Amino acid sequence: MPTINQLVRKGRHSKVTKSKSPALNYSYNSMKKESVFNPAPQMRGVATRVGTMTPKKPNSALRKYARVRLSNLIEVTAYIPGEGHNLQEHSVVLIRGGRVKDLPGVRYHIIRGALDTAGVDGRKQSRSKYGTKKD
């Protein structure tokens, strides 16, 4: 327990929390050619590689992912949710934060139904999460 005098001299410091989706915290100033701290909920990017990866033990699957070069010039790995997708190299995608627990290094999700990404076909429930229109 600190004394009053110690609190007057030093004060209390709040803990600094590290961002779970750091690439969304910066935008790029092309005039100055530098990154600027400017947090955003989503960000646009271009898919540079689309493929599958296998999850950590004890799970087994082929999870779809895309390597995305964001508009702030940072390259990240993003998960493609839902069954089936239409993404190819050079597709323009919108990403949000949110990790995939069994894929190491995947901290972002691609938003279905936005930009070049189509919604999931034939989806009846949880449609808003997968960008599917009402039939």
Swiss-Prot record:
The modification 3-methylthioaspartic acid is found at D102. Belongs to the universal ribosomal protein uS12 family. Residues 9-18 have a biased composition (Basic residues). Part of the 30S ribosomal subunit. Contacts proteins S8 and S17. May interact with IF1 in the 30S initiation complex. NCBIfam families: rpsL_bact. Residues 1-20 are annotated as: Disordered. One of its GO terms (molecular function) is structural constituent of ribosome. This is Small ribosomal subunit protein uS12. Signal peptide: none annotated. The keyword rRNA-binding applies. With S4 and S5 plays an important role in translational accuracy. Interacts with and stabilizes bases of the 16S rRNA that are involved in tRNA selection in the A site and with the mRNA backbone. Located at the interface of the 30S and 50S subunits, it traverses the body of the 30S subunit contacting proteins on the other side and probably holding the rRNA structure together. The combined cluster of proteins S8, S12 and S17 appears to hold together the shoulder and platform of the 30S subunit. One of its GO terms (cellular component) is small ribosomal subunit. Disulfide bonds: none annotated. InterPro entries: NA-bd_OB-fold, Ribosomal_uS12, Ribosomal_uS12_bac. Pfam families: Ribosom_S12_S23. Keywords: Methylation, Ribonucleoprotein, Ribosomal protein, RNA-binding, rRNA-binding, tRNA-binding. GO terms for biological process: translation. HAMAP family: Ribosomal_uS12_B (MF_00403_B).
